[in-house]
Amino acid sequence: EMMEKEEKYNFKRAVFLVDWAYNDGKPSYENFCHEIDSITTTLKAFIRINDAYKYKTAPNWAIFEYFTKSNPMNGNKPFVYDFDDFMGKQDFNKLLVTKILKTHTGQCTSMPLLYKILCDELGGHSKLALAPSHLYIKHIGEDGRWVNVELTNGCFARDEWYMQTFGISTEAIKNGVFLCAFSNKENIAFIMQLLASSYQHKYRNYDYFTLNCSSKALEYAPNFSQALVIKYLNLASFKKSYIQTIGKKKSDYIIRVNKEMHATLNVLDSIGYSQISDEEYQQNVERALKETETMKAKDR
């Protein structure tokens, strides 16, 4: 409904529902909203005390301070990157917002999701954007130009940094695969793929629920890379199950699955999609953190 009807769009609730489904109906939406409201109230007071309401980026500034600096707003506990199981392969909660709210440790999924929820609640402007295996925040600065907020190391990054660090092609940018601000529909498409991934992690299976998550997203965002990847993984799982059960016997079903797999790969290739290994990603984050510490040391 959130993709089909703009009036039903509610990013905060969409993010919550993934958490709620994965954790068997916990926490309650009321408790989740109460925690978000509490943070939002603190951020509003911070903006008011600093007389920053005259700036359109006041919400972005307040949230960045909340995430990255030791201050009373966050209990003198800034948010830091959690390198332990950062892809959520052992515990999918590592990717979810309720975990980061409790621990102030997160990674490139939970940090931007919480940032955007808070920014929406404050009436500010923020967008999600993708790089290979990475999610980050974009918003319009006071000068009308895009600003990239990199919460994993508490800095602002240029597009060129993402291109060099993650090996992003100009083709992928032109096709809206990477470094491009999500629309509301793409926000929900991303959350649907997060839901599909959480389902697969919980039940150790791709099935027609996970396929439906990707198919529904692709109806509204045909080149959305996350959905194309989930679709391909579904089809590959169906093919594997078929071979294990029936063997390599040809049938209309397996011919159709193979055809869809090739078509999906062709789309991913044509739009410039690329990915990096977990090891490469960890090295990128560690390098970025070291660069940040070096810059901070020079400023002292």
Tell where the protein language model's regions lie, with residue ranges.
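Hydrophobic/aromatic-rich core segments of domains that either
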Residues: 110-175
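Amphipathic alpha-helical repeat scaffolds of TPR domains
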Residues: 181-202, 223-245, 274-295
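Short coil/linker segments at helix-helix boundaries
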Residues: 241-270
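Active-site neighborhood of thiol-dependent amide/isopeptide-bond enzymes
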Residues: 78-135
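Canonical positions in the second alpha-helix
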Residues: 216-217, 268
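Stable alpha-helical elements in mature extracytoplasmic
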Residues: 59-63, 111, 115, 210
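Helix-turn-helix repeat elements of alpha-solenoid scaffolds
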Residues: 165-172, 203-212, 257-258
